[in-house]
Amino acid sequence: MTQFLPPNLLALFAPRDPIPYLPPLEKLPHEKHHNQPYCGIAPYIREFEDPRDAPPPTRAETREERMERKRREKIERRQQEVETELKMWDPHNDPNAQGDAFKTLFVARVNYDTTESKLRREFEVYGPIKRIHMVYSKRSGKPRGYAFIEYEHERDMHSAYKHADGKKIDGRRVLVDVERGRTVKGWRPRRLGGGLGGTRRGGADVNIRHSGRDDTSRYDERPGPSPLPHRDRDRDRERERRERSRERDKERERRRSRSRDRRRRSRSRDKEERRRSRERSKDKDRDRKRRSSRSRERARRERERKEELRGGGGDMAEPSEAGDAPPDDGPPGELGPDGPDGPEEKGRDRDRERRRSHRSERERRRDRDRDRDRDREHKRGERGSERGRDEARGGGGGQDNGLEGLGNDSRDMYMESEGGDGYLAPENGYLMEAAPE
């Protein structure tokens, strides 16, 4: 279909001109001709040097030997510098050391951001301060982390020396000591090979791990020929740390056991309380049933007694008729027409009824006293009392009169409720007459 396009569009589809041919700059590898062919090194062997005439090989320095050499050179150079500075060091003629040396306190390990006003606020609590000198680097002008504080009174310096050591200022615990440069004869600072610290004495086998005023003083003042006393101190410190850890573990276990015992006792108390409440509810239900049955029995006995009294009055009015029929309670054939068994039988009925009422009253009082004793024993938590109460309650259930199962308080209450003439207090709802002689 392109042949039907107009000429201007057909010109766009026309092919380009071919790439012009250029001759190569070099010949191809197979076209090259070598004038001199390859040969070996045999003709040149006679030009080599004789091995017998070669110089001996030079021994190169290894990496370990180079490091040891540099360390040795550094130590020698540092010793020379220390000897030179020792000749120039004189703390008594130092222009920066001013004031009384026995009133000056040395404070180290100070935070680099701590200012002089902050140090003054922290150390003024021990006494009035005369001057504070913070040490700065001469080259960079930055603080070096220690200062000298001069107090107006020597006693204030001693107080700060005792109580300010280990005080945390701006997140760092400072170390407090007296100024030893002008007070101790032959004293040398740490940079000149002296000082009290044992953390920079050498390698890991010589340095101590923990630094501080007390530890370093013990390190320097410890007598004995031991070449490495810090090992004994580290061993003692590790032993003390293990003992403290064991004591903390024992105390923690003791607290856990006490808490478990408290929980166990509380659970046992709750269980005992639930058991006693169930027993108390059962006793109350039993007492309620007993009272209802007693009330019904009492009403029945009252009706029977009224019927007997009513029937007994008819027998006494007509003795001739009563002689033919024997009474209900007495044996047949014993009562005559004029015999005195009728009034005696009534007296026995009254005595029997009185004993029954006394027994019911005693049982009611005994139940009430039992509940009261149970509550008392629950509050006291005495097992012996509870065991004695159970024995008393079990032993008093089979008695007829019910007084042996009662305590002294219950027996006294029962005696107080009974009158001097044989009458009981009107708690039963009616008064009982005394039995005839």
Swiss-Prot record:
Family matches, as Pfam families: RRM_1, U1snRNP70_N
Subcellular location as annotated: Nucleus speckle; Nucleus, Nucleoplasm
N-acetylthreonine: residues bearing it: 2
Residues modified as Phosphotyrosine: 126
Protein name per UniProt: U1 small nuclear ribonucleoprotein 70 kDa
Region span, Disordered: 48-79, 187-437
Post-translational modification: The N-terminus is blocked.
Its job: Component of the spliceosomal U1 snRNP, which is essential for recognition of the pre-mRNA 5' splice-site and the subsequent assembly of the spliceosome. SNRNP70 binds to the loop I region of U1-snRNA.
Gene: SNRNP70
Composition bias, Basic and acidic residues: 60-79, 207-254, 269-286, 294-310, 343-393
Subunit structure of this chain's protein: Component of the U1 snRNP. The U1 snRNP is composed of the U1 snRNA and the 7 core Sm proteins SNRPB, SNRPD1, SNRPD2, SNRPD3, SNRPE, SNRPF and SNRPG that assemble in a heptameric protein ring on the Sm site of the small nuclear RNA to form the core snRNP, and at least three U1 snRNP-specific proteins SNRNP70/U1-70K, SNRPA/U1-A and SNRPC/U1-C. Interacts with SCNM1. Found in a pre-mRNA splicing complex with SFRS4, SFRS5, SNRNP70, SNRPA1, SRRM1 and SRRM2. Found in a pre-mRNA exonic splicing enhancer (ESE) complex with SNRNP70, SNRPA1, SRRM1 and TRA2B/SFRS10.
GO BP annotations, alphabetical order: cellular response to retinoic acid; cellular response to transforming growth factor beta stimulus; cellular response to tumor necrosis factor; mRNA splicing, via spliceosome; negative regulation of chaperone-mediated autophagy; negative regulation of protein refolding; positive regulation of mRNA splicing, via spliceosome; regulation of ATP-dependent activity
Organism listed in the record: Homo sapiens
Residue positions, PTM Phosphoserine: 226, 268, 320, 410
SMART domains: RRM
Biological classification of the source: Eukaryota, Metazoa, Chordata, Craniata, Vertebrata
Listed Gly residues bias regions: 192-201
Residue ranges constituting the RRM domain according to the UniProt record: 103-181
